[in-house]
Amino acid sequence: MIIRETLSYDDVLLTPRYSDILSRKEVSLSSFLEEGIMYQLPVISAPMDTVTESSMAIAMAAAGGLGVIHRYNSIEEQRRICVEVLSTGDPACAAAIGVTGDYLERASELVEAGVLTLCLDVAHGHHSLMRSAIRSIKSKFDVHVMAGNVATKKSFEDLADWGADSIRVGIGGGSICSTRMQTGHGIPGFQSILDCFRADIKRDVKIIADGGIKTSGDMVKALAAGADFVMVGSM
């Protein structure tokens, strides 16, 4: 039984339209994530141990984007990497933590080091552990909380209600993450963005498209569907 038809990035093309823009240099895709910090490039590198450490985070900042330092290391090593990134003078530094174990200790060390965004990094974000973690982090630290991953309007609304400031939308379907294929759960990425953009929430919670983005055209489609930022691990 088909519950409903959904759209993936491959199912969609944007219609070419008339323009009076004289140069691509005139186009701005800049967006805020944390309060007061404008990103010229709405792209975030994924918190994977093969993707984002100091060199990638520094390069992303130089390009106008953001890198999220992965959590698959010791607290001391993750803090050291973040300090190295911040030493370049760019205030934008994000780092991933979990929702169990040492996550509060890790969060404390990272915030003390100057990290402005903590990414609560789990495969299935619509979970009681995520709710507890978001509320604990927000009650203890003055920090932007990026949470996820989710794929439905209801899950987006719940994470926003729990206190998340930005939410990663997308379950699997990426070049590395295979959650959708391994578990049989998920919604095509383009559809997830459309649904979450229509969420009934009372404040500005940023949508981060994550997963299933294979080309620069997919990034454009994600932004057109309502995403504020796009997260990628490879392309």
Description of each model-found segment:
Residues V43-A46, G67:
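Non-catalytic, soluble scaffold/interaction modules
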Residues I37-Q40, M48, T52:
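Generic, well-ordered alpha-helical segments
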Residues M1-V43:
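An N-cap/entry alpha-helix motif that binds or orients negatively charged groups
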Residues I3, V12, V51-D210, K214-M235:
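Alpha/beta enzyme core
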